[in-house]
């Protein structure tokens, strides 16, 4: 009997999906694979991934959680998404979305856009005044999303650096004790902030949640929602800024187009979101569990089966995107990528993330037209120990 392909697949590249993932995608949309905890179905093609993302028969929670091997960081992530309990997921996750979706209103996003653009201008001013080489990650990619999510939550300026460091530590899979301790620091801080805002409300998400449901939401529950916004509201944007810069530097013709015409920034952002997935040690997978039988092609996924949705592979599926590997700002009416998911679990903060990325890429190469890596790309270190991956350093000259 042939041995099943084993996840995670080896991926020597900083950008892009694993070669084995590409090979499996060519063979068909669904294949049985082995993971650390259990066997699973791997879905690699665009149409099937999109359909399953919106299929209510798939859920976050495992009906037999004791069999699945999960890091402490992943357990924390599942709990924040109300996906750690099979019996409660169907009610708790929709309730979370019902409370949080209005917090990302058009009015608030309009206000946030002006503030984000100001943050980007200030960070680029500081970067341009520095002596090269400069760490772009520390100067721009990390502080911007941290500022933005702290603006949303009403976190005081003095607390933002430590909040960002705690949040990063929470998703560290290499040290369970550190992950637990930093997450507890985030929870404790959020509880204190909620209690402070009960007497000193502001124009922020926590203050609005305190007033929601006639003030009946508990401090603990509001703090839980605040932790979810914080932890999911900035880490992936940090990674995408870094990877977007690398994509631009790899594609000088597209970079020149953007520098000449900043109106192409939204198109650049969509290509970054589509292609800046994967990376060394990452397969860009969304784990789900079948809550009832599902048929994909001629294969039946049985109730309780684990399913891995390969977002990175779906986003470079040649059936959906002509010349899918090309970074191309001139794509005409491209299909929607799935960097933010799809369907009932579509990322709540996707509009905000797009605003942040657009503000960065409208400005970065106009302000720093000679921006280049200060080290060979292959020397950049992908953080395999972090759930979201990414880099801790991007040295550049300008």
UniProtKB/Swiss-Prot annotation:
This chain's function reads: Catalyzes the final step in the biosynthesis of the sesquiterpenoid antibiotic pentalenolactone by mediating the oxidative rearrangement of pentalenolactone F to pentalenolactone.
What EC number(s) are associated with this protein in UniProt? 1.14.19.8
Stated family: Belongs to the cytochrome P450 family.
Give the species: Streptomyces exfoliatus
Q: In which pathway does it act?
A: Antibiotic biosynthesis; pentalenolactone biosynthesis
Q: What is this protein called?
A: Pentalenolactone synthase
What Pfam families does UniProt report for this protein, alphabetically? Answer: p450
Which PANTHER family is this protein grouped with? Answer: CYTOCHROME P450 BJ-1, P450, PUTATIVE (EUROFUNG)-RELATED
Record's keyword terms, sorted:
Heme, Iron, Metal-binding, Monooxygenase, Oxidoreductase
Cofactor(s) this protein cannot do without: heme
Give GO terms for biological process. Answer: pentalenolactone biosynthetic process
Q: Which NCBIfam families match?
A: PentlenlactSyn
Q: What happens when the gene is disrupted?
A: Accumulation of the precursor pentalenolactone F and lack of production of pentalenolactone.
